Amino acid sequence: MHPRFQTAFAQLADNLQSALAPILANHHFPAMLTAEQVSTLKNTAGLDEDALAFALLPLAAACARTDLSHFNVGAIARGVSGNWYFGANMEFLGATMQQTVHAEQSAISHAWLRGEKGLAAVTVNYTPCGHCRQFMNELNSGLDLRIHLPGRAPHTLRDYLPDAFGPKDLEIKTLLMDEQDHGFTLTGDTLTQAAITAANKSHMPYSHSPSGVALECKDGRIFTGSYAENAAFNPTLPPLQGALNLLSLNGYDYADIQRAILAEKGDAALIQWDATAATLKALGCHNIDRVLLG
């Protein structure tokens, strides 16, 4: 078990500990539960879905990287597939505050990058900030997405974001988590192809500036992130943050990164290179390449 989970795990009910122990035994537990695992945990612990999600929130929050605020937020995105995806906030010392990943963004991008097609609910241990409410409004679940908070009745995103502005106001039909493939040809080595594949998945209906990042760890493991734009622009999630989020959720550290590649168009309206390189260098990675999409 990764050390970050030990304190939260010790506070769980005994029957839930017994069911979770083999799942968490892997140091690189992927911070997600399959629909089958969720069903097993519900039956073993005698909990319904909502109660189980609340019980697991401390494990999600344990994934937080909060060197600046020391305020850990955990979230669980519940996919329409039945799979559950952990998320937690991330802060990057030496970079800028704008590079921060919020817990809801973390869980949602985690689900998206693992191929989830839509979300039924998000469970989070603190009320979503305005930034996250706007980020969630880009999803194909729209304002019907259910939000679950401890000690409160569940509400929809519509309740938390009244008079919402979103992609429909800009006549955008393809939403975040809808399947997208921009068709860029895969070239180069495995890591380069992974970055291009991530760029092909980009949600960028406002700037038409696709981009993807691939990070290779010293053990050969590769994590990718795709660009996810938002109708309100500022809640947009850059591709590097998506990749770093997956890397961290899987129990890796920034020091494990040995190489990074950004794939983007050289003539795009928005360019990720400077911000991507600056953030990676702040985290200790200097082996950074860029491939131009054709």
From Swiss-Prot:
Record text on cofactor binding: Binds 1 zinc ion.
InterPro entries assigned: APOBEC/CMP_deaminase_Zn-bd, CMP_dCMP_dom, Cyd/dCyd_deaminase_Zn-bd, Cyt/Deoxycyt_deaminase, Cyt_deam_dimer, Cytidine_deaminase-like, Cytidine_deaminase_bacteria
PROSITE patterns: CYT_DCMP_DEAMINASES_1, CYT_DCMP_DEAMINASES_2
Gene3D superfamilies, per the entry: Cytidine Deaminase, domain 2
Keywords, sorted A to Z: Hydrolase, Metal-binding, Zinc
Domain CMP/dCMP-type deaminase: start-end pairs: 48-168, 186-294
Residues annotated for substrate binding in this entry: 89-91
Top-level taxon of the source organism: Bacteria
One Gene Ontology cellular component annotation held by this UniProt entry: cytosol
Binding site for Zn(2+): 102, 129, 132
EC primary class: hydrolase
Catalytic activity: cytidine + H2O + H(+) = uridine + NH4(+); 2'-deoxycytidine + H2O + H(+) = 2'-deoxyuridine + NH4(+)
Keyword Zinc found: yes
Active site: 104 (proton donor)
Subunit field text: Homodimer.
Family: Belongs to the cytidine and deoxycytidylate deaminase family.
Protein role: This enzyme scavenges exogenous and endogenous cytidine and 2'-deoxycytidine for UMP synthesis.
Protein name: Cytidine deaminase
UniProt organism field: Salmonella newport (strain SL254)
Source taxonomy: Bacteria, Pseudomonadati, Pseudomonadota, Gammaproteobacteria, Enterobacterales
Gene this protein is translated from: cdd
